[in-house]
From Swiss-Prot:
InterPro entries: Ribosomal_uL6-like, Ribosomal_uL6-like_a/b-dom_sf, Ribosomal_uL6_a/b-dom, Ribosomal_uL6_bac-type, Ribosomal_uL6_CS. It comes from Ectopseudomonas mendocina (strain ymp) (Pseudomonas mendocina). One of its GO terms (molecular function) is structural constituent of ribosome. Keywords: Ribonucleoprotein, Ribosomal protein, RNA-binding, rRNA-binding. This is Large ribosomal subunit protein uL6. Belongs to the universal ribosomal protein uL6 family. The gene is rplF.
Length: 177
């Protein structure tokens, strides 16, 4: 069995899990998420714990059991606490403003960028150079953060661009004559 799959997923109070065939749904205070469980993975509910096992001893099925356990754990954390990613804008005149489901970005181009946020993701701008992306789906929050960062990645000479709050930008020295 996968080392990851050996650990059970503990369900906190207020989180409901329903298993109908291969469809697993998780409901919590912040919302609900669904997952199609792979046919080679068996999900066992014991009280307030979920255990995962491969249906046969095949190496690929063991790995899939660990992957499914990690996905379900992220779903449980998402519906109970939620996920957030923080981005910083570094550069003169770089600004961000959240208006509903649209994020307006001024990143030094000749035109402003209007980024339409997908359903299930909310963006906040505590100030003009910070963006907070929040949601219950870890993959979607990370995807949105990566797409916003891709508009203007941090460049290595001055460090200007959109970066994750915890990101360390590798700097280069300018050419000398």
């Amino acid at each position: 069995m996968s080392r990851v799959a050996k650990n059970p997923v503990v369900l906190p109070a207020g989180v409901e899990v329903k298993l109908a065939g291969q469809q697993l749904s998780v409901k919590g205070a912040k919302g609900a998420l669904e997952l199609n469980v792979h046919s080679s993975v068996e999900v066992i509910q014991e009280g307030s714990e979920l255990r995962f096992a491969a249906r046969n001893g095949d190496q690929q099925n063991k790995a899939m059991a660990g992957t499914t356990r990690a996905l379900v754990n992220n779903m449980v954390i998402g519906v109970s606490q939620g996920f957030e990613r923080k981005l910083q804008l570094v550069g003169v005149g770089y600004k961000a403003q959240a208006k509903g489901q649209v994020l307006n970005l001024a990143l030094g181009f000749s035109h402003p960028i209007d980024y339409e946020l997908p359903a299930g993701v909310v963006a906040e701008t505590p100030n003009q150079t910070e963006i907070l992306i929040k949601g219950i789906d870890k993959q979607l929050v990370g995807q949105v953060a990566a797409e916003i960062r891709d508009f203007r990645r941090p460049e290595p000479y001055k460090g200007k661009g959109v970066r994750y709050a915890d990101e360390v930008v590798r700097r280069k020295e300018a050419k000398k004559k």
